[in-house]
Amino acid sequence: MQVLIVRLGAFGDIIHTLPLAADLAAAGHQVGWLCEDRWAPIIAGSPVIQRIHRLPRKALKDRALPPLARFLALRRVVRELRAARYDAVIDAQGLAKSALFAALCAAPRRIGHALPRAREMSWLISRRRTPVAATHVIDQQRALGLPLCPGQHRRGSWRFPLPAWSAERRWAEQWLARAGLTKAWVLNVGAGWPTKVWPRARQVEFVRLLRARRQPALLAWGTHVEHDLAEEIQAEAGHGILAPPTSSPQLAGLFAASAVVVSGDTGPLHLALALGVPAVGLFGPVPAERNGPRGPGYRTFQAPGAAWERRDVSKVDLGAIAAAAVVVAAEAAMRERLACVTASA
């Protein structure tokens, strides 16, 4: 069966949906994926995804683009989807825009989340609605595949069929060698929501603790604002090296060659989980039990504060997470991961 997954973004959400693609492929289905073009590199080359449909972000976001140009760009995507002749489509996002493309692809079977997971009336498009029975978002996504592969999501642990990214891994190893970084601790300084960013003072304290331990530190960033924050942390802590500008695959290469990743609830944290790199997740507005990494080699902290608050940092106290406690958790995660790898060797 030809199955289309509609998950347009973002970084972490794409990662969280990969186990669904793995389940579908294991059940013998051919998997296609519709996502925004900027996120396509995360899944391009995945061994379980046969076709990627790239939705031009400008066609969705850029109001300066002439209406006709936007219409033509979107029409090209719809025609491409219909030409693929999918047998089933899974709306793994649950928003109006994802539901629209799920409907326009013309697959006879449409599967999506039920209320309250589905929003913006998207549930009206789905002919098969999956109720939210699981706590973790990955398990919620995998449940969408049950109508097409019953019981598949109960077999074993999460699987993340990432691309090999061989060239990016070689590039990362060469860059780290030139920078003199061997098994560095990675601190991802930013996040998409202001309320998910560990306060600068805590990040400075964390890097200073690494300096006292003579532990190499790599400061990862994604936007210009995060780059400036990383520079400030480096200057104030007197330690750490800023990562270069990277694509998602290049960031994966840096993570794969590092000892541990410390990050808020954002794409890079979930990438570390998918790569099997030890990680410590710092959570605030979103519950760690819903979004956080789990299993050997992973630790999470949950700060007090308002649930799902995006912008008002006064309502989420990420500063309650102490730097020293994060160091201890990172050490435990690395030991646990090493023991797991050794036991399976």
Cite the ranges covered by each PLM segment:
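Catalytic machinery of carbohydrate-active enzymes
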Residues: 1-345
